[in-house]
Amino acid sequence: MSDHEQHQAALNRFIELANELAADGVSKGVLASALMRAAAVYATFSVAGNKGALTPEGIERATTFFKDNLALVQKARQQAAEQPKEQLKEKAKE
């Protein structure tokens, strides 16, 4: 399995778990906060191990990484929202 495929599979499992927790009554705000905290904990572990911590530079790099990923998600969602509009325009031209 390629890195991209592994990434997508892991992403889907996290979303499935979040959806299960939401179905159990956990609020979206609590879930979003918990997922971000889990990402912060795991990012720290992946760089510094169980007993280490990120340097201020490491925190900045992780923050930038999250910001860049958030921007990619928003761009994809905006493009997906615009596609039906473009399809309607094309059908109107026919």
Regions picked out by a protein language model, each given a short descriptive name:
Residues M1-E94:
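Solvent-exposed interaction surfaces and binding hotspots enriched for charged
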